[in-house]
Amino acid sequence: GEERRPVFQSTARDFIEKAIESDRAFLAAYNPEVDKLAFEREWTARQSGARSEVHSFEPNYQGSSVAWGPPGSSCSAIGSHQFAARAGHHLAPLRLASGQDVFEQLGEGFTLIELGVPEGGAEDFAAAAKALNIPLKLVRDHHAESRDFYQARLVLVRPDQFVAWSSNEDTGDASSILTRAVGAGP
């Protein structure tokens, strides 16, 4: 409920209802029975307008209590498509240095993508996951292009392929990060 309900509400309000109101206003202003030429001209011009709606439709859970989104953010259907690994957003596709697609490497539980971190960073997560009995797969790719693409050195991916947490810095408290990501802590 915390994540998906607001996204469904946003989809209804910000896209479906908005499209219905836009169509209603258009048909009130341009009636083909009154002025067919004006209707056809505006109809043609209108066809290119949906692109912005397509680009802004990006369901995300950045306001979720189990994601490290920006303070004050909310779960919504409105967002922006980016390659950066952002908490609460779907992981972008990437061909790893091994030649495999990142999605082929994700585990059934959580996955930590390690893109070149100080020694021990990924191991801290592995040890914490084991102690907490949280399924965690480690994927390592030290290719600089991958790090630049995701704009992070560590990316914690949920089972639904959404990013729970990412960092370019210190790993932080791996146990607290995992506990929050599974909804068992603040």
Tell where the protein language model's regions lie, with residue ranges:
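Helical substrate-recognition/capping region of FAD-dependent monooxygenase/halogenase enzymes
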Residues: 1-186
